[in-house]
Amino acid sequence: MLTCFYGTFALGTLYWTLHLLLRQETPKALTNVTTRITGSVRELCTAAAAACRALGYEPVLLTDRLCCEAREAGSFLGSVVRTHAGGGRKLAYIAGGETVVHLTGKGLGGRNQELALAAASALAGLKHCCVFSVGSDGTDGPTDAAGGYVDGETEAALRAAGRDVYRTLADNDAYHALQAVGGLILTGATGTNVNDVAVALVE
């Protein structure tokens, strides 16, 4: 009887909601409107490339449509660094877009922090190489960080701090791991949001 009452109540609410919506005036097209796109993930990648070029790196745009599991993207960027490290060229591999994280643990972090941490093992022992990833709005997940940074010394530093990269990733606790080794990127709110950008620097 209770189920029947609530079912009838829900249908009644739905009926009146639809009735009121259908009685509203249809929105009219606005006149004298100009729409301009003032920022995009492509422009974010272009700006990242310009910054890298100013530092003497040759930028390579991998994609501005990055959309996969964060740890897979990080592992891939780490492998790119490993492949090209020591080749005598200063290269900056850039990937823009937005990755995802499927939660398996109870830790703290965000997709950019997880991406960076996932690259740490591939970079282990390398000199003058790093991977970092940041959210353009200055916020990554439910944290105060914009993203994360790892280099050839990160994995050893994590081990010394009693942390294992793979166990940390399984617990989705990239924030505390990177915090322990100075790998968090903190920018504060930027006032914009055009996805994320990840950069792998190689020498």
Per-segment meaning from a language model:
Residues 1-2, 7-76:
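Accessory alpha-helical/coil subdomains and C-terminal extensions
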Residues 70-80, 86, 101-115, 141-149:
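Short glycine/threonine-rich loop-to-helix capping motif typified by GTGT followed
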Residues 92, 96-126:
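Conserved mixed alpha/beta catalytic, RNA-binding, or beta-rich assembly cores of soluble enzyme
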